[in-house]
């Protein structure tokens, strides 16, 4: 197995991120699903310069992005967005795209269950066909009930993947699993054969090793089902503005170049902009916890 990490949490240049993770020993990057922000030729050059490769990307389902929207035109725009993410990953020689079907933060349905299910299937089939032609895997990611009402558990993601296509996969996330699964390890086992990605954060969404999850057992279960690809670090530190914050210098009160989209994404995840020192600590802690298990 290898270690990858996201870059959507901190507002900094991509080179700053890549330089940091390369120095620590990471070999992969899971680039933010913002294809409009990146010149893929320049990104490829940076990755090659620091001997890091693109693992894939994760969709940022903000605003009107919703593959199961009631409005057909909205669904079409959302499909095109995910295709654009797939294209970016293809141009970066990546491997997979993790897809959250619905808008993050939307917890109220707008149609009957069977309607939304069919809209999601139809939208994902279109993306799946495009991804397969591009040689990129799709992984449907379940996230917790406080961020979406649609797909929360591995079994739900598996059912959707099976409805979409034979090579459509799932991407599990330890933080969400800790909230939604009766048994994390059984959920991993049931994903055997369809697991194309695995996001890692501890139960409190801090870096692995800063909570109570059993990382040795998680990695062992992944090996048990034959998953030997990439663990993608995706911590997202919780917002703490109280005197009880154990990391008083963690909040970046004046972040530079934080886009409205990135700010909204962090807020939807109960987080905020963090300082370079704190972010580097989380990145380092993740590597130290996981690298010895691989």
Predicted features by range, described:
Residues 48-49, 72-169, 252, 257-268, ...:
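Active-site acidic/histidine proton-transfer and metal-coordination neighborhood
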Residues 1-7, 29-31, 54-59, 97-99, ...:
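Hydrophobic faces of well-ordered beta-strands that scaffold small-molecule active sites
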Residues 1-2, 11-22, 151, 158-168, ...:
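Histidine-acidic metal/acid-base catalytic patches
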Residues 28-50, 58, 101-112:
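Glycine-rich, proline-tolerant flexible connector loops at the mouths of alpha/beta enzymes
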Residues 16-23, 37-58, 87-94, 125-134, ...:
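Acidic (Asp/Glu)-rich catalytic clusters
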